[in-house]
Amino acid sequence: RKEYAYYGLATCAVDGICQPRCPVNINAGALIRRLRSENQDKLAATGWKIAAQQWGIMDKVAGKSLTMAKKLPFPVVHGTTNIARKVMGDDMVPSYKKDLPVGGPARKPHKDATAEIVFFPACVNSMFGGVDGDGKHDPINATQAFIRLCERAGVKYRIPDNIGEMCCSTPWKSKGFTDGYSIMSDRVLKSLWEATDGGRLPVVCDASSCTEGLEVMRKKVIEALEHKIVNGLTPGEPDFSRLRMYDAVQFAADNMLDKLTV
């Protein structure tokens, strides 16, 4: 019991990947998320709620901070973040490590009336820049690589107008911060509903964990609607069950390989 707070609650990845291996098919991740939500730190929850409200700013600050940190002596940055973590808490201030890259390029909208997909570039790829096999900076990160693949394969895409303010909500979901999660999921699903023309176009994300976050977000909202509405959706209510989420790797394998000349 004494060790469970750390080994059971604090360090669980809450991604549910253990469920397929569980002999009784239990999703321990969902349980841990609920327990974290019930025992959330109020200050941290408030901070993450504000972060959800101002995510466009937070996203840019994170990327620029990493770029700036790379130019300073490591002991200075590492020591500063350690002090800040002790004062504000581990959930509020991330720890800085020497092998972290510089910040990535900002996400930008992309319009195309003939789009075949809606591309959802993950904010993690704008916060963290790309690296090559030796750990050195590479201007081509996962987002840029997928865009290049689309261009080579002739796949038309669009990126939502307010993409800079959006996130898959995994940080809030995994930490159990329900208020921030609701703010972000509401923003993302409404934007994707509009960008996909009401679910006509598939959504493709360039980070696997973020694809999972988008899918969980969609399912949670559908479950909430099912509890509220017995006889179907009310008129004008978006039917988010029509949204289709795909990981970029799987989408490329299924829909782009035969269009590429290697």
Regions inferred by a protein language model and the residue ranges of each:
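Iron-sulfur cluster-binding cysteine motifs and their immediate structural context
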Residues: 1, 11-38, 213
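Short beta-alpha connecting loops at secondary-structure transitions
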Residues: 1-5, 17-20, 41-50
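Active-site-adjacent structural elements in folded domains
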Residues: 1-7, 255, 259
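Cys/His-enriched microdomains
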Residues: 7-10, 16-20, 166, 201-205
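Iron-sulfur cluster-binding electron-transfer modules in prokaryotic oxidoreductases
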Residues: 28-262
